[in-house]
Structure formats: C-alpha cells, structure tokens
Amino acid sequence: MKKRRSKKERQELLQQTIETNPFITDEDLAEKFQVSIQTVRLDRMELSIPELRERIKHVATKQHEEDVKSLPLEEVVGEIIDIELDRHAISIFEVKVEHVFKRNQIARGHHLFAQANSLAVAVIDEELALTAKSTIRYIRPVKLGERVVAKVRVEDVENDKGRTVVKVRSFVGEELVFTGTFEMYRSSNYSEEGNNL
C-alpha cells in the first residue's frame, strides 16, 4: 500500500508543479496528487497561489501588446501567453457556449482555425502579415469547456520573397487536436491608407 504524503510535502510538490506548469487545472492537480479538488483549492489558498485564470493573466502580462506588430492584440483569437517574434508563440483558447454547436457541444472548426491563424499572423515581425496559403488538419473534435493551447513555430523566413512558413500545433492537455502549416505574406512597406504594398 502506497504511503500518503503529508500535507506539507503535498503542498511543496503542488507549488513546484504549478511553477513548472502554470496552466495546470485544479482537476489535473487533484488527479495527480490523488486528493479532492476542494483539497487542491484549499492548498492553493494557503500557499497564496491564484486560480488558473489569474495565473494565465499574470503570465500574459509580459508586454505582448508592445511585441505584436502585425495586428492589435484584441484581434488575436485566444490569449497570447508567450511570444518571440519570428520564432514562436503560444496562445490559450477556452471553448465556451458561444463557440460550440448546441446539439453536440462540439466547437465549431472555424474557432480552432482562427486561433491558429491569428497566432500565425501575430508571430510575424512586420507591420503587415497576411495568410497566403494554409494546409490544416482537424484531428479530433474539441468540446465545450476544453482549453486549446496553440503552439506556433516559425519554420522558414524568406524576407527577399516576403514569405514565411509557420507551423501550428494545437493541444487539449497532451492530446494533439489540430495542425496547420501557414504560408504568410509579410511586408514592412505598409501604410494605414493601404498603399505602398
């Protein structure tokens, strides 16, 4: 029979786990430590660790507004939690009632595409970035209440041709649910009036 951890030991491990993965849910923590969700919440309160939504907001305040050039941050579908222009980016999208089909509670595909596509635009280090071509694959349906984490990696930057290839992989937990390859048009010769393209 496995010996139960002491409260102090469990709380230390819980704190380490959250520091390593700030996006872990209370449900996942409860399962990991084989305790109730209420116990996890009480432990978090005692340790002054905020709930998941607050932890996400805290991570997201890394001045992403100043980083993203190609579109206003509010136009990104999902919440950017990490970005390094022309390298990689991560966003989180919470599937809510307005994103699903009423009949089966499955997320409409265009929301997953929009999360991936807007993150592919945001990662481009130019004033103008547009999707020239995309190849996408939906791997499994995403349901109401699930959290989709999209990870974008810039594969190839061809500044002389004004093109960049971006790969997107979206996950629910550890499970891959969506993949995409986006060929992005980029230009620094852009003005608000739309000329100089």
UniProtKB/Swiss-Prot annotation:
GO terms for biological process: fatty acid biosynthetic process; negative regulation of DNA-templated transcription; negative regulation of fatty acid biosynthetic process. Keywords: DNA-binding, Fatty acid biosynthesis, Fatty acid metabolism, Lipid biosynthesis, Lipid metabolism, Repressor, Transcription, Transcription regulation. InterPro entries: HotDog_dom_sf, Thioestr_dom, Transcription_factor_FapR, WH-like_DNA-bd_sf, WH_DNA-bd_sf. One of its GO terms (molecular function) is DNA-binding transcription factor activity. Transmembrane segments: none annotated. Coiled coil: none annotated. It comes from the Bacteria. Belongs to the FapR family. Transcriptional factor involved in regulation of membrane lipid biosynthesis by repressing genes involved in fatty acid and phospholipid metabolism. NCBIfam families: PRK04424.1 (NF003359). This is Transcription factor FapR.
